[in-house]
């Protein structure tokens, strides 16, 4: 028996895959699962979550391919299996295009490191938002500065 939310999740996942793989009219952004999706959708971008891709790949029996590819690339077996599989599935050509890469330092920072590695290989830009752990006024001020520097280099006067 399927619950209504399962159908909504499936429909959303299929629509997202269609946008990522067949519609290049909107920029695709690779993000970690903890990045605020409201920022991505609000800017008219289409998000891709490498960890989610690895989970879907596992459901399709593709994890061995992803893990073998990541091992061949030198990724340590000590890393998170989702991220190792994601690195391998990307290398094998199973992941969609990316127009930009962004991540947060919130909770899991391995995906941010994976994306930074991809950016290094591709020679493009990367934004890492350093999310404070405590929700107080000084943390909010810090995060506002981080957003300005990371997302608006012209406004901050800092070029990357």
Regions found by a protein language model. Give the residues of each.
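An N-terminal assembly and electron-transfer interface module characteristic of large anaerobic redox
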Residues: 1-160
